[in-house]
Swiss-Prot record:
Superkingdom classification of source: Bacteria
Protein name, UniProt field: N-acetyl-gamma-glutamyl-phosphate reductase
Organism annotation: Brevibacillus brevis (strain 47 / JCM 6285 / NBRC 100599)
Compartments (UniProt record): Cytoplasm
Family statement: Belongs to the NAGSA dehydrogenase family. Type 1 subfamily.
């Protein structure tokens, strides 16, 4: 059994990890940590987990974590993991970090976009970017995983197959993304109050969202050339789900059939990416509660653009689900273990 601890157990990401790990056949939830509810049972914050026999919440302390956990999930705000993760890894504990602290290779870029001091460079270099479908071999041997952001996951899985083909101008990508409000976390914020979000949709952090450089960095790794992305996120009045619509300018006379075949071949052995039939229109409802990313390809021959549609559950493939997928790979377990294979519908 893999003994796991969860730091940030009283947030949405922590709660979703508990939902998955409580039923995982190879996991024992050994410890839960919170900076605000020490000594409480988690059911005080989340009544829906009552009866699971979970440990009470403990204070966050690296020294006490090392003896009882094989792996720690860090579902914490930016700036926390950068100091805690190195201490844990040095004590022999593997770490999967759900924050952005180890995703960006360039410390100056991190500071610009996240407004925090970056993690020590040697630890950023040691971290593996946990987009499982593209970095599975590296994930398997890692001690520190930078779990990708929700928007980057939906975007990168859609765009990456095209980045080495030369079929699309690398700087032409426009990414329109829409997310449910759970992506903002559980903290109180005016922007996610019911009366503010119900029957409304709005863009936010236009040209300034911190996931922008993460997307560009990973695309550039595949293309080998500087890649800029116009990324605009929107908040929509639903709890879970992300829909990405990405537009790229074609540079070659390729057909939708060719691109469809490329994607089907790329993801043929990837259990959590479903390439939908040509011309499909995936709904977020069709991946709700699951670890799937559904992708559909369209080509507008009139404008010579490829249009990619990608949907995920932001709490699952965009956060906790992908983290559990990475854990499975790290501990040489079947990749799908403990992850629901049928989305919740309707």
């Amino acid at each position: 059994m893999v003994r796991v601890g969860i730091v940030g157990a009283t947030g949405y990401g922590g709660a979703e990890l508990i939902r998955l790990l409580a039923g995982h056949p190879h996991v024992e939830i050994a410890s839960l940590y919170s900076s605000s509810s020490e000594g409480d049972g988690l059911e005080k914050s989340f009544p829906h987990v009552a009866g699971l026999g979970l440990p009470t919440l403990s204070p966050i302390d690296a020294d006490s974590m090392s003896g009882v956990n094989d792996l720690i999930f860090l579902a914490t705000p930016a700036g926390v993991s950068s100091t805690l993760s190195p201490k844990l890894v040095e004590k022999g504990v593997k770490v999967i970090d759900l924050s952005g602290d180890f995703r960006l290779v360039n410390g100056a870029v991190y500071k610009t976009w996240y407004k925090h001091e970056p993690a020590p460079s040697q630890w950023v270099e040691a971290a593996v970017y946990g987009l499982t479908e593209w970095n599975q071999e590296q994930v398997a041997g890692a001690s520190l995983i930078a779990n990708p952001g929700c928007y980057p996951t939906a975007t990168l899985l859609a765009l990456l197959p095209l980045m080495k083909t030369g079929w699309v101008q690398s700087n032409s990508w426009i990414v329109d993304a829409k997310s449910g409000v759970s992506g903002a976390g559980r903290g109180v914020s005016l922007g996610v109050h019911y009366s503010e979000t119900n029957e409304s949709i709005h863009a936010y952090k236009v040209a300034s969202h911190q996931h922008t450089p993460e997307i560009e960095q990973e695309l550039q790794k595949q293309s080998g050339e500087e890649t800029l992305v116009q990324f605009t996120p929107h908040l929509v009045p639903m709890t879970r789900g992300i829909l990405v619509t990405a537009y790229g300018q074609l540079t070659a006379d390729v057909t939708q059939v060719q691109i469809q075949e490329l994607y089907e071949a790329t993801y043929a052995d990837k259990p959590f990416v479903r390439v939908r039939p040509a011309g499909s229109h995936p709904h977020t409802k069709e991946v709700y509660g699951s670890n799937y990313c559904d992708i559909a390809i369209h080509v507008d021959q009139r404008t010579k653009r490829v249009i990619l549609l990608s949907v995920i559950d932001n709490m699952m493939k965009g956060a906790a689900g992908q983290a559990v997928q990475n854990m499975n790979v790290m501990f040489d377990l079947p990749e799908k273990t403990g992850l629901p294979l049928v989305p919740v519908y309707p």
